[in-house]
Amino acid sequence: MYFSGEPAQIAEIKRLASGAVTPFYRRATNEGIQLFLAGSAGLLQTTEDVQFEPCPGLTAAGRGVVSPENIAFTRWLTHLQNGVLLDEQNCLMLHELWLQSGTEQRRWEGLPDDVRDTITALFTAKRGDWCGFWSNEDVSVWWNRLCDNVLPEKTMPFDLLTVLPTRLDVEVNGFNGGVLNGVPSAYHWYTEQYGVKWPVGYE
């Protein structure tokens, strides 16, 4: 493949072509799913009386105490409601909210049984959408891996999501949708925005 242009631009294109781009959106997506599960299980609560119409179960635990963790969750929920774009700047902001939510310290083995049961049921139903169709990753492994707070260094070749940002609500909704009412599935979003259902290249 041949590219012409300024050296800096060519270098950026080659990085995109090889997947040598940090996928900030992927971390924001995974942490968003984790916060969605934490809220659905009542581990985190909003600091205001909020009803999240696309998925009432997310705020069914009701209003919680005013704490740094719940304040961060409430702010994250606002971005979910607004369908914030997962560009690099927004992803860094969402990661900061995830850190403030204290989820990093809430490892699986320390969660109450009822919380784990709720998270397991929700995760199992959407594992194929959230972790890949062929994934058999146990929810405890997935949860603790996110708590380790490791940012992926590379992504797939020609990952268009690093160029044309996707949306937080779309990614939480998953490829097949069904989580957030009134929000497009990732399949519909990808085909409309990128013209393909898998907006990445393959080696």
Range-by-range predicted roles:
Residues 2-203:
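Long, contiguous binding/interaction regions
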